[in-house]
């Protein structure tokens, strides 16, 4: 089967938004080539081999989307271009935006990359395991089964990794967790496996909602509820922890709303914040929260705060 490969060159800041647009347009797969991710993974012991050419590229991110050849494929590509350019109106830097389109065979991308994706340990005991890989838990490790590439959130991106490390420290046995913009469901699944009592996960993107449901089922979890919601609009009740791994503009918008959905002294974990906008986000967060800790990795930061 032939597929259309759409290669978008953009910035780290725009990476997540571009990926989400691709999924919303029905991409059969999305692959992100990020030099910083390669450097991060190289620090672990989960790789048998790392090609030196992977370290030669610096700067821009390349995001590849794969669409089946159909009568509306050209229209989808044009919509993709328009929506990426539109990101500038939301204050997102798309950099030297470039799009290349080519035709590829399914075998060139659908399965070959899997041999290089290995179980990844994050924090003290979290292990992200691709669904096709065999792995035996060591000691107190908790295994998160995931089919990467279907929606944002595989554990390799700095924003997701920092959230997982924070969750390992803050989730308690009686915790109720709200995951806003859940993507693949990785943060919700991890919260449940860390012992949370109830977890509610939502995304505005129907593809992400379906993917998160599949991953929850893959992990045999009964206490994680996944649904469609525009940010917090469909959430009910109050949580001990609200996590949002989104983008700076949305974190700023959410900051005034999150306290209404948090219990007294509840925690707000915000990630997906590019370093260049950290101070802007902090200024808004500090209006409603006491900032407890800030973590930085690569070009990104995550903020843990407590309701005032």
Swiss-Prot record:
InterPro entries for the chain: Ribosomal_L11_MeTrfase_PrmA, Ribosomal_PrmA_MeTrfase, SAM-dependent_MTases_sf
Catalytic reaction(s) noted: L-lysyl-[protein] + 3 S-adenosyl-L-methionine = N(6),N(6),N(6)-trimethyl-L-lysyl-[protein] + 3 S-adenosyl-L-homocysteine + 3 H(+)
Q: Which keywords, in A-to-Z order, does the entry hold? A: Cytoplasm, Methyltransferase, S-adenosyl-L-methionine, Transferase
Assign the protein's first listed, main location to one coarse class: cytoplasm
Specify the superkingdom. Answer: Bacteria
GO function term, MF aspect, one: protein-lysine N-methyltransferase activity
Biological process GO terms, please? Answer: methylation
Q: Where are the transmembrane segments?
A: none
The UniProt entry's GO CC annotations, sorted and at most eight, read:
cytoplasm
Which residues does S-adenosyl-L-methionine bind?
160, 181, 203, 245
State the top-level EC class: transferase
In the UniProt record, the gene name given for this protein reads prmA
EC code(s) of this entry: 2.1.1.-
State the similarity comment: Belongs to the methyltransferase superfamily. PrmA family.
Localization terms from the record: Cytoplasm
What job does this protein perform? Methylates ribosomal protein L11.
- Identification of the protein by name: Ribosomal protein L11 methyltransferase
